[in-house]
Amino acid sequence: MRAVVFAAAGTAGQRCTTLRRLIVHRSVADEVVARVVSALRRLPIGDPFEPGTLVGPLIHETAYRDMVGALESARADGGEVIDGDRRHPFAVEHPSSYYVAPAVVRMPAQTPIVATETFAPILYVLTYDRLDDAIALNNAVPQGLSSAIFTTDLREAERFLDESDCGIANVNIGTSGAEIGGAFGGEKQTGGGRESGSDSWKAYMRQSTNTVNYSGALPLAQGVEFG
């Protein structure tokens, strides 16, 4: 839950790796949504220069209007805005700033607005019945930067890593904040950037394969016996 909340609301939803879609198994969707809403309501929202603040304002009025428009589109598509459809009370003290409450929206399907990057703290909740459906939903958007799965099933994790159409695919950690040091880049309409990651160094390095045997025996391939 902490990973979901951080990825959805961190930097007020204005990261390229922000969690925009939460794809939850239908059997636990109600419980998960209730916990997410409860956690988001407790987030300290305010001046980002003050210690303890976790969510600051949107960057400008245009970003706020984009968020309002996205929520209106979600409603028109049959979505239920459960929480967050308002400016935060902190905005009363700072009327020229755009502090907002993170929004949670349950959607009946993955509509065009769900597949659009708004760069605002909007979390669209979709449900699935089979892992195949969840992976298909994950991939059926124009972007392909960061994705994550939470599971205790190693086979599910391996399938997701193999089939996620994203440059970053995580297991049991959120979409945002775990990518430093690796090759950072995406697929489809998402920009590149892998040349800025540490993996790019390998293009300038010589490679050496090393096998170190710490046993007292001589291991041989293909079951060969020698002396």
Regions found by a protein language model. Give the residues of each.
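ALDH superfamily catalytic-core signature
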Residues: 1-109, 171, 219-220, 226-227
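Conserved C-terminal structural/oligomerization subdomain of aldehyde/semialdehyde dehydrogenase
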Residues: 44, 92-95, 99-227
